[in-house]
Structures are given as C-alpha cells and as structure tokens.
Design a protein with these regions (language model features):
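Selective transmembrane helix interface/packing segments
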Residues: 1-268
C-alpha cells in the first residue's frame, strides 16, 4: 500500500519468535500431558500447571469473580507468558553475537541483512508500538467484558456512578472517557519505559570504558575501568533485569485483570 511500510523489522521478527516459542512450548507440553494413560502432571507440566493456577487464583479470580474466571484466565495467561518470554529474549545477546561474528569473520557490507539486524535493541516490549498493541487488546477486553456482563448500552451507562445528579454529567462523562484512554496509555508507557530503562543503564555503564579510554588516551585504562567497574555493574543490572522481567509481566497482567474486573463488577 502506498505510503505504508509493511517491511519486517527486527522487533516484528522478535514478536514472531516469541509467539512461536510460547505457542510451541505450551502445545508440546499439553499434547505430551494428554497422551499419558493417566494424565498426571510431572516435570515441565508441573510448572505449567502451577503457573495456570497462580494466574487464575491470584489474578483472575479476585478481580473478575468466579462466574467469569474461566472466560478471562486464558487472556491473562497469554499476556503474562508473552511478556515474560519477550522480555527474557531481549536479555539474550543474540544479535550482539551475530555482530561479533560478522566483525570477525563475515565482514558483510554496510547495507547487508546482517548489518540491519545488529542495529537497535532486540527487546520487542521496549518498542512502544508493541506495548501499545498489547494495551489496545486490554482496552477492547474491558469493553467486551462490560458488555457481556451488563449489555452494551448499560456498560457505557456504568461509566457514570449511580446516584449522581444529571447536572454534572457534562463534566463526568468526558472525565470518564479520558480515563478509559488513560488506562491503556499508562500500560503502554509503563512496560516500554521499564524495559528500555534497564538497557540504557547497561549501555551507559559500559560506555565508561570508551570514556576513560578517550579521557586518558590509554586503552589499558579503559580496559581496567571495564574490568573493575563497568562489567560488574552491568552484570548486576542484568541480574536485576531478570526480576524486572517477572515484575513487569505480573504488573501488566494484574492491571489488565483489575480493569476488566472493574467493568464487570461495577459496584466495586
């Protein structure tokens, strides 16, 4: 289409990879489980069952209620697994290794596919377009949940608290509509900013090597700073990133469940 670029970017490639890993892993584990004569979870399936129960009991059930828990748990599970895998793959230096191989062995041209792959970050959830797409799913899930629970028209009526004078409707309605848009915007910014911040911090710390190299005009000083300061700090932040991966996936999933639950349980 004229004016629209549909080329496959690095983040699109990573999204396909993440989707394939999540779908393939869950499908393989489920089929292996169902092929047993006595379906008893063991090994990897124990972890899958624990994750399903944890999301269902700690996130879905308290927010959407027992009536809708089966309907909405799959969405929350998909969000959590997708975000965890996307965040985790971003920590693996796949394209950095490709860059080193290219530098040492391949020596590809400036406009080659390899050069295009090694430019930019590899964490799909650090791209605001990706997190905006996830938040858009949450936005429509809220509308669908409220419409299924109360009817389409009543769902929109529920935006205004009951018992409020109609005289202040012109003030409340725009505020509530803005609130509907702020929720997915907040989800978008929170996830992308948190996943971007850690990588920026690591790059900033590793840049000390080059800064001290230029400052003292000595490669030995740069390497020394890297060994004594930059590398240990970068490793520490990378370890912290592992925690952030789980926390951000949990927070995004929890907030989605809270927003969906608010549309269903209006009295809350």
């Amino acid at each position: 289409i004229a004016g629209i670029n549909f080329s496959v970017t690095k983040h699109v490639l990573m999204l396909w990879l993440v989707a394939g890993i999540v779908f393939g892993t869950v499908t393989w584990a489920t089929r292996r489980y169902l092929k047993q004569e006595r379906p008893v979870p063991h090994g990897f399936m124990n972890a899958v069952e624990w994750l399903v129960q944890a999301i269902r009991d700690s996130i879905a059930l308290p927010n959407v209620g027992s009536k809708y828990v089966k309907a909405w748990t799959p969405l929350f599970l998909t969000f959590f697994c997708f975000i965890v895998v996307a965040n985790g793959i971003g920590l693996i230096p796949i394209f950095e290794v490709i860059g080193l191989v290219d530098y040492a062995l391949l020596h590809s041209g400036e406009h080659s596919l390899v050069k295009r792959l090694i430019h930019g970050g590899a964490t799909a959830t650090a791209n605001y377009n990706v997190t905006a797409a996830l938040a858009t799913i949450t936005f429509f899930a809220i509308i669908i949940a409220g419409s299924k629970a109360h009817g389409f028209v009543q769902h929109w009526k529920n935006l205004v608290p009951s018992g409020v004078s109609k005289a202040i409707y012109p003030i409340l309605i725009p505020i509530e509509l803005m609130g509907m848009l702020v929720r997915p915007f907040a989800l978008t910014m929170r996830l992308a900013a948190n996943m971007t911040g850690g990588h920026i911090a690591i790059l900033a710390i590793l840049s000390f090597v080059f800064l001290f190299n230029d400052l003292f005009n000595s490669a030995a000083v740069g390497v020394g700073v890297g060994m004594m300061l930059s590398v240990p700090l970068a490793v520490g932040i990378s370890a912290l990133e592992i925690v952030i991966i789980l926390v951000q996936a949990y927070v995004f999933t929890l907030l989605t469940a809270v927003f969906v639950g608010m549309a269903i349980n209006v009295h809350h």
